[in-house]
Amino acid sequence: MNRLPTCLLAATLFLGSASLYAEEPACARVRLADPGWSDIAVTNATAAFLLESLGYQVKIDTLSVPIIYGGLRDGQVDAFLGGWMPAHQDYHDKFVASGQVERLGRNLDGTRFTLAVPRYVWDAGVHRFEDLAAQGQRFNRKLYGIGSGAPANQSIQKMIDANQFGLGDWKLVESSEQAMLAELGRAEKRQRWLVFLGWTPHPMNIRHDLRYLEGGEQYFGDRGQVYTLARKGYAAQCPNPARLLANLRFDLDMENRLMSDALEGTATPASATRAWLKANPRVLEAWLQGVTSRDGGDALAAVRGQP
């Protein structure tokens, strides 16, 4: 009797209709990770709403980026929707390229993550990384980053350690995303000079008049992508939720809008997501392609039936 090769069988389990296979009890709960970033809050909220509509339980743990990658490797985290590239290149090389963590798919294109300054600093002539050192006193020789352990912070520290762009005597200030943006707000009120980590998608691009510095591609890369990652073997063990997570595709406008609604208005990431999906129902057909409810039912009907 002919036997399917192991790799073909694994692909069939993932790509075929998940309802044809008995799902392991461990798949009933999907464990996601959140590094405390606004973009991942809204993409996690989207994934959680869809998964819960299909009959799954969702647990979201707030963890630092190094702990998230370690959790994926050790099987303590099922999936992470925040694999920013090239910002996470070192983590990719250590965990993904080595086969300890798997990629389910790319969920966003066109991202940017690099140092930025307020518009009034740009107008004064600071356009490139090379322009910073000459104005060190005005910047108080500080580069404002985000949470400790973030890959972007590591890139800044490498730049300082190498005295790149003459920044060897500068200091990295690590804080949460929210604290960094609060510092930006205070600086803007006083027209104080500040250089900080900026990125898109994020409502900071709407709320603040900022400009991205040029010339830092060696450390921050150019336009990037965000990938959905999973623990090794997750797609084979839990093909239905893995298929949904692999199907998720976002765009910059959607994420900026959802984050703005959640951060500036009265909406939470979850309520902002539901409102967006009700206004944009056609996206569900692509996201739910090849997916069923946990009991094998119609996924589209299950999601559309939610209040």
Model-derived features with residue positions:
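Immediate post-signal peptide segment of exported/extracytoplasmic ligand-binding proteins
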Residues: 21-31, 134-140, 287, 302-306
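Short, well-ordered beta-strand elements
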Residues: 25-39, 56-61, 140-144, 245
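Pocket-flanking alpha-helical
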Residues: 44, 61-99, 183, 203-209
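Ligand-binding cleft/hinge of the Venus flytrap
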Residues: 47-54, 136-170, 278
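Ligand-binding pocket segment of bilobal, Venus flytrap-like solute-binding proteins
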Residues: 77-81, 151-218
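A conserved helix-loop-strand patch within extracytoplasmic ligand-binding domains
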Residues: 99-152
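C-terminal functional modules
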Residues: 108, 251-307
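A bilobed periplasmic-binding-protein/Venus flytrap-type ligand-binding module shared by bacterial periplasmic
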Residues: 112-123, 225-237, 261
